[in-house]
Swiss-Prot record:
Belongs to the protein kinase superfamily. Ser/Thr protein kinase family. This is LRR receptor-like serine/threonine-protein kinase FLS2. The modification Phosphothreonine is found at T867, T941. It comes from Arabidopsis thaliana. Residues 870-1155 form the Protein kinase domain. Both extracellular leucine-rich repeats and protein kinase domains are required for flg22-binding. The LRR 9 to LRR 15 domains are involved in flg22-binding. It is an enzyme of class 2 (transferase). GO terms for biological process: defense response by callose deposition in cell wall; defense response to bacterium; detection of bacterium; receptor-mediated endocytosis; regulation of anion channel activity.
Length: 1173
């Protein structure tokens, strides 16, 4: 019995230990696979794998992150957010029972092992947020059980293969934020169980597969941040379970399919940052569950459909950066769940919706860059959750509502670039503001004290208002301030020394005020300051030494103050400077050579001072990287121009004019191949103008070497300057002939050669065709066909006739003279008879007129038919002298018919009509309205036929509904057109033709908005002459009040200077959008437009900018633009001088405009550098 028991025990133990050994052997591959996984980990900072050690049996199932089934096989490896670093071992394939592999948010690198395709039981592969690279292993697509594939946020590359469509079990696919390329497979629609497909942030191309529209179970689709093209498939309207559709930041085009309105489950619709066009579909109003609709940054047109205001679940509505139009409906107040509303950068008009205050959950409201008018709601303070209110760049008026102080959570307030008035309300200190920008308005009064209680404020811009008072010492409390802009106001007093407390300040703009005194030494505490503009104040004294401790300073503008003394050598410490302007002060002494350390300068202006001595060569050599502007003009500098100037190979503008430089132009200057403008005028330079210097300067627009002592011939290389617009060589000692090559420069509009010793023939083509005689005077040996030049004669050998021959010639000459007398008597007799006949029937002379004019003579009936019997509906302009009708000839030609008012014309003016019609038909210039023909019937009709101008007249463009001419360059271009036409009238014909009624209504714009001067013959047809005489029987022709020159209104004297006056008024009107009469100043005193402009310039740049039209004023972003506009307005005042002899001629005006155009065309400063925030 004992033996039996002992045997049984031995057998039991034997089977037990055999079972253990067998179990250990069956799990060994999985354990080894896990060990290999652990060996692939190079860093385990949290020690999560420290328990991966064999102790006893089956212990691997208890390791961190491991889950086994009931038989002990590993079915899940889940190691989320464990900070593991390393590679994924291919041995993972030996976990043959593995169903879930989740390595979310670690730092695995290398490729995903191809062996992973052997895990036939795998249904979830989650490798989200790692650094896996390479392509997606093809074996994954053989995993028949996988339904959850998440590879987001890795570095995977390659295409999405067609094989993905074989894995029909997939429910979720996540490819977000990798480097995948190629097209989305068209067969994606075969994955019938797919609920989520997200592939944002890759480089996918091609169109969106239409087959996606068949995925009935799809709830989430995100393809944002790729380069997808084509249209949004209309089949998406079949996705009734779709909850989130995100296609943002692609290149999609076409319209938003109305069919999306069928996706009744949609909660989120994001289509922003594409190139979508067309209307916002009204059908989107059917998406009653929609919470987020963001379709901003597209090219959508139309108004906001009223159906959108039914989406009461909306929390986010983003329609900004489109081309949407119309008013913002008061129905916006129905969207009471709205938290974020962005409508900025559209073309919305109408008044600010008062119902906006119903949106009590609103945190962000942006409506900037529109044309919204009206006032902000008085109860704006009801929006107590508001954090961001941005309504800049609109047409808002009225005050800032005082209730805004109830918006205690408000952090950002931007109301800049509007027309708001009143004082800045108190209560700002109650809010949590970090950003305040209310510049470019009409706010008055002082900066309220409690604004200085905004202790978190980082940006404060109150620039370009009518603020008065001082900048108070309380400013020192805003110690988090980074940007402070108070420029373009009327602040006075000293700059407070407490400003030195603002140690985080990056930008400080104090310019264009009335600050006085010295720069406070405490400003040296602003060691983080990068931009400092204090120009156009009344600051004085020397620059304090402490200021040069601001080592990060990049922009420094101290121009137009009263600083004196020498330019401190300590400027050399400001090695980060890229922009330095000391222009318009009282600095004296020499230019410090130590400034050579300022090697990063792009703009350097020390003009208009009292500087003496020479330019240090080493300074110029250090500026070799300068790209924009070097100006040392209007000083007392001497010596030669340093050869080192040639080191500035990238500079665009050099001005050394009005100094005392001597010697010759350095040959090294030829290296400055990028220069646009070069001015060495008004110096003592001499020698030949070196031909080789200018051979490579083919970018130059303006070259001025006038008022020097240059000798020799004009270089032939000037003829190679294919962009040259203005060339001034006047007042030198140049000799030789004028190069014919100058006549071939099509761009050359202004050429001055006066006061030299030039000789020979003056070319007759190109710029010489319309050159002013005054620009050639002082060259006694020049000849040509243009008056008052003497004609070029060819000397011939003397002829010697015999005595007999001379007698014969005398007899023949006498006989010829007798015949000529008889012929003249006969002609006079015929003329008297003809004159008598004309009295009975004046029409008898018209055939001769037809012949003389070489114009088509229209029958009055033709014009009646073309204008529908001169229907009043076709009137496009009228005055006391004429009415202009739009008409259409039988051949389809659209014309303008100018019918003269016979009551205002004497009978004697008939003969002037013939004479002047003949004269006017011979005028040919691209900026004059061409005369196509005429119609005449004694006592009934007197009309001119003109081409029809598609864009109307300048009057409508400035004051009417026509598209405005906004930019400075566009305005200058228009003035150049007008001036060119008038200059041709004044000096391009055999005798001057005075317009006498120049005004915006008489300037027409063609389809390309090129200006054409019209009505330039009316005065002559009436019989007015330059001497003031007239044959008109009435005083009908009295010009237009406001544009009429004083001497014409009172003396009836007609000269070209009368047109110059009118042109000056037109230029002012174009810049200000103010009519020339019925203006009032701030004291309600009557004033003219000229007085308004003159007063504005007298008030400094702040006043000047304020008088400009808003669009132009808002476009000013740099000091150079301000200076160009100031020059333009000064030219206007010059043109409108009360004495005619003080006004320039039209050629001089054209020259000045071309120079201004060159400046306006070459502005290169960054738009944000001088723009008020």
């Amino acid at each position: 019995m004992k033996l039996l028991s002992k045997t049984f025990l031995i057998l039991t133990l034997t089977f037990f230990f055999f079972g253990i050994a067998l179990a250990k052997q069956s799990f060994e591959p999985e354990i080894e696979a896990l060990k290999s996984f652990k060996n692939g980990i190079s860093n385990d900072p949290l020690g999560v794998l420290s328990d991966w050690t064999i102790i006893g049996s089956l212990r691997h199932c208890n390791w961190t992150g491991i889950t086994c089934d009931s038989t002990g096989h590993v079915v899940s490896v889940s190691l989320l957010e464990k900070q593991l670093e390393g590679v994924l071992s291919p041995a993972i394939a030996n976990l043959t029972y593995l169903q879930v592999l989740d390595l979310t948010s670690n730092s695995f690198t290398g490729k995903i092992p191809a062996e992973i395709g052997k895990l036939t039981e795998l249904n979830q592969l989650i490798l989200y947020l790692n650094y896996f690279s390479g392509s997606i292993p093809s074996g994954i697509w053989e995993l028949k059980n996988i339904f959850y594939l998440d590879l987001r946020n890795n570095l995977l590359s390659g295409d999405v293969p067609e094989e993905i469509c074989k894995t029909s079990s997939l429910v979720l696919i996540g490819f977000d934020y990798n480097n995948l390329t190629g097209k989305i497979p068209e067969c994606l629609g075969d994955l019938v169980h797919l609920q989520m497909f997200v592939a944002a942030g890759n480089h996918l191309t091609g169109s969106i597969p239409v087959s996606i529209g068949t995925l009935a179970n799809l709830t989430d689709l995100d393809l944002s941040g790729n380069q997808l093209t084509g249209k949004i498939p209309r089949d998406f309207g079949n996705l009734l379970n779709l909850q989130s559709l995100v296609l943002t930041e692609n290149l999609l085009e076409g319209d938003i399919p109305a069919e999306i309105g069928n996706c009744s489950s949609l909660v989120q619709l994001e289509l922003y940052d594409n190139q979508l066009t067309g209307k916002i579909p009204a059908e989107l109003g059917n998406l009653v569950q929609l919470q987020a609709l963001r379709i901003y940054k597209n090219k959508l047109t139309s108004s906001i459909p009223s159906s959108l205001f039914r989406l009461t679940q909306l929390t986010h509505l983003g329609l900004s950066e489109n081309h949407l139009v119309g008013p913002i409906s008061e129905e916006i107040g129905f969207l009471e769940s709205l938290e974020v509303l962005t409508l900025h950068s559209n073309n919305f008009t109408g008044e600010f919706p008062q119902s906006i205050t119903n949106l009590r959950n609103l945190t962000v409201l942006t409506v900037g860059f529109n044309n919204i008018s009206g006032e902000l709601p008085a109860d704006l303070g009801l929006l107590t959750n508001l954090r961001n209110l941005s309504a800049h760049d609109n047409l808002l008026t009225g005050p800032i509502p005082s209730s805004i102080s109830n918006c205690t959570g408000l952090k950002l307030l931007d109301l800049s670039h509007n027309q708001m008035t009143g004082e800045i309300p108190r209560g700002f200190g109650r809010m949590n503001l970090t950003f305040i920008s209310i510049g470019r308005n009409h706010f008055t009064g002082e900066i309220p004290d409690d604004i200085f209680n905004c202790s978190n404020l980082e940006t404060l811009s109150v620039a370009d208002n009518n603020l008065t008072g001082t900048l108070k010492p309380l400013i020192g409390k805003l110690q988090k301030l980074r940007i402070l802009q108070v420029s373009y106001n009327s602040l006075t007093g000293p700059i407070p020394r407490e400003i030195g407390n603002l140690k985080d300040l990056n930008i400080l703009y104090l310019h264009s005020n009335g600050f006085t005194g010295r720069i406070p030494r405490e400003m040296s505490n602003l060691t983080l300051l990068q931009g400092l503009r204090m120009y156009s104040n009344d600051l004085e004294g020397p620059i304090p030494e402490e200021m040069f401790d601001m080592k990060l300073l990049s922009v420094l503008d101290l121009s137009n103050n009263k600083f004196s003394g020498q330019i401190p050598a300590l400027f050399s410490k400001l090695e980060s400077l890229t922009y330095l302007s000391l222009q318009g002060n009282k600095f004296n002494g020499s230019i410090p050579a130590s400034l050579k350390s300022l090697s990063l300068l792009n703009t350097f202006d020390i003009s208009d001072n009292l500087l003496t001595g020479t330019i240090p060569g080493e300074l110029l050599a250090s500026l070799k990287n300068m790209q924009l502007y070097l100006n040392f003009s209007n000083n007392l500098l001497t010596g030669t121009i340093p050869k080192e100037l040639g080191k500035l190979e990238m500079v665009q503008e050099i001005d050394l004019s009005n100094n005392l430089f001597s010697g010759s132009i350095p040959r090294s200057l030829q290296a400055c191949k990028n220069v646009f403008t070069l001015d060495f005028s008004q110096n003592n330079l001499s020698g030949h103008i070196p031909d080789e210097v200018f051979q490579g300067m083919d970018m130059i627009i303006s070259l001025n070497l006038s008022r020097n002592s240059f000798s020799g011939e004009i270089p032939q290389s000037f003829g190679n300057m294919t962009h040259l617009v203005s060339l001034d060589l006047s007042s030198n000692n140049l000799t030789g002939e004028i190069p014919e090559s100058l006549a071939n420069l099509s761009t050359l509009k202004h050429l001055k050669l006066a006061s030299n010793n030039l000789k020979g023939h003056v070319p007759e083509s190109g710029v010489f065709k319309n050159i002013n005689a005054s620009d050639l005077m002082g060259n006694t040996d020049l000849c040509g066909s243009k008056k008052p030049l003497k004609p070029c004669t060819i000397k011939q050998k003397s002829s010697h006739f015999s005595k007999r021959t001379r007698v014969i010639l005398i007899i023949l000459g006498s006989a010829a003279a007798l015949l000529l007398v008889l012929l003249l008597v006969l002609i006079l007799t015929c003329c008297k008879k003809k004159e008598k006949k004309i009295e009975n029937s004046s029409e008898s002379s018209l055939p001769d007129l037809d012949s003389a004019l070489k114009l088509k003579r229209f029958e009055p009936k033709e014009l009646e038919q073309a204008t529908d019997s001169f229907n009043s509906a076709n009137i496009i302009g009228s005055s006391s002298l004429s009415t202009v009708y739009k008409g259409q000839l039988e051949d389809g030609t659209v014309i303008a018919v100018k019918v003269l008012n016979l009551k205002e014309f004497s009978a004697e003016s008939d003969k002037w009509f013939y004479t002047e019609a003949k004269t006017l038909s011979q005028l040919k210039h691209r900026n004059l309205v061409k005369i196509l023909g005429f119609a005449w019937e004694s006592g009934k009709t007197k009309a001119l036929v003109l081409p029809f101008m598609e864009n109307g007249n300048l009057e409508d463009t400035i004051h009417g509904s026509a598209a405005p001419i906004g930019s400075l360059l566009e305005k200058i271009d228009l003035c150049v057109h007008i001036a060119s036409g008038i200059d041709y009238l004044h000096s391009g014909y055999g005798f001057p033709i005075v317009h006498c009624d120049l005004k915006p209504a008489n300037i027409l714009l063609d389809s390309d908005r090129v200006a054409h001067v019209s009505d330039f013959g009316t005065a002559r047809i009436l019989g007015f002459r330059e001497d003031g005489s007239t044959t008109a029987s009435t005083s009908a022709f009295e010009g237009t009040i406001g544009y009429l020159a004083p001497e014409f209104a009172y003396m009836r004297k007609v000269t070209t200077k009368a047109d110059v006056f009118s042109f000056g008024i037109i230029m002012m009107e174009l810049m200000t959008k103010q009519r020339p009469t019925s203006l009032n100043d701030e004291d309600s005193q009557d004033m003219t437009l000229r007085q308004l402009v003159e007063k504005s310039i007298g008030n400094g740049r702040k006043g000047m900018v304020r008088v400009l039209d808003m669009e132009l004023g808002d476009s000013i972003v740099s000091l150079k633009q301000e200076e160009a506009i100031e020059d333009f307005l000064k030219l206007c005042l010059f043109c409108t001088s009360s004495r005619p002899e003080d006004r320039p001629d039209m050629n001089e005006i054209l020259t000045h405009l071309m120079k201004l155009r060159g400046k306006a065309n070459s502005f290169r400063e960054d738009r944000n550098e001088d723009r008020e925030v």
